[in-house]
Amino acid sequence: MSSRILILLFFSLGSAYPAESGITGSILGYLFDPATGVQPILGIPGAATIGQPLILQTAISRVSLSLWQSYALAIAPEDSNLLLIRLADPASVAPLAIPIAGSGLIAFSPSGSTAAIHDRDRNRILVVSGLPEGATLANEIDLSSFSGTIESIALNDSAASVLLGFSDSVVAIGADGHIAPVELVGHAGGMTFLYNSSDAIVADTSSSKVYLLRNVTGATDASVLLGDFPEAAAVAVSKDNKRAFVASSLTGSISEIELSSGSVTSASCPCRPSTLAPLNGNAVFRLTEPNGSAVWLLDGDSQQSRTFFVPPFRPQTTEEPVQ
């Protein structure tokens, strides 16, 4: 039996089928638990729960949620096309006319209008624009000339700039195919572009520094945002582009940087952050994966940034009547 956990979702090639989700009330966003599937995070910061899984029936092996949380991209072992899952109520799943041989990483631009998918079998990066309504394959990046294992991807909203993080280097690639090594970064622990921008935040775990890179595919100008930040696991920016956030998997610390002034404040989490996945709000992020335990979130929209947990999901059970 395959080691991949398959989630049952209903799907028929060429059609999209709605499914009843029963979602009501405020939604902070969505998450994907391999054991249960795609689930809404219900409520508000500090008072949230994980809702019932969306019921969509087909076998899928990978799901990645868009940063705007309105849709997801998925890979199905029984289908060669990229799948689009719409997370509205009712939810639905449909194929995109974009074939993919074997998926690795899937990364979204800040607004979720573009995505980059690592096609491992063909050793390429597929750049998809026009998401979610008019998805088209905008570019393919051949990875055969690069050494090292690809570990992270970031791209901007116009699909004109892509950052690729390998095990031993980081490179910037323009829409024209121009390749520019980011020589001051040895290994990216996390990287993201600003919204509607060619500027990016990159955390270098080899030097424990966090950089702001202006115009990454042109005459790049770099400035140090943090000079000593160990084991950065993820970076993110607020939707208004005013603040950057960096999370450490070693200390559980999340640094908040005002990009205009460079001032830094910190929040702590009794967890080991592995992501900064944006949720609804200007600066609300998920810090950890579910994996059957509590999920930790960061509320950067409160007067002072704070972390809080969402209790683990407990499936509803129906008691058998006593005979």
Predicted features and spans:
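Sec-dependent N-terminal signal peptides
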Residues: I5-L13
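An edge-strand/N-cap motif at the start of beta-rich repeat modules
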Residues: A19-A47
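Repeated scaffold domains used in trafficking and secretory/extracellular systems
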Residues: A19-E20, A59-Q69, I100-G112, S145-L155, ...
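Conserved beta-strand positions in repeat-built beta-propeller and related beta-rich domains
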Residues: L31-P34, S66-L67, A74-E78, S109-P110, ...
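Structural motif
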Residues: G37-P40, D79-I85, R122-V128, D168-I173, ...
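Short loop/turn segments that connect beta-strands within beta-propeller blades
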Residues: I44-G46, R86-P90, S129-E133, G174-H178, ...
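A short beta-strand motif characteristic of beta-propeller blades
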Residues: A48-I55, S92-I98, T136-S144, G177-L184, ...
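Solenoidal tandem-repeat scaffolds enriched in leucines and small polar residues
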Residues: P132-Y211
